[in-house]
Amino acid sequence: DAKALAGIADAKLKHTETGDKSAPVIENVEIKKGDRNELLSGIKEGKELKKAETNDRSAPVIPADAKVQEDNRGALLADIQATAK
């Protein structure tokens, strides 16, 4: 709404100071740079993976003896048309 925003354009905002939170929270901690070449060589060597068992639950949960009833839509429409005449 233009009327509501008209007063905001002329408003003067107060100056505010923000705290620098980029420094580590834990004191006396050094962050070491990792050796990039060592990391890449480790990736290239590969790692033997453990065998994983999976539980495939993607199948629908419908009983095996479930039946789909016959579609009686045609008969219903015929009854409606017959009574409408």
Swiss-Prot record:
Pfam families: WH2. Keywords: Actin-binding, Repeat. Residues 35-52 form the WH2 domain. One of its GO terms (molecular function) is actin binding. Is able to bind two actin monomers at high concentrations of G-actin. This is Actobindin homolog. It comes from Entamoeba histolytica. The lineage of its organism: Eukaryota, Amoebozoa, Evosea, Archamoebae, Mastigamoebida.
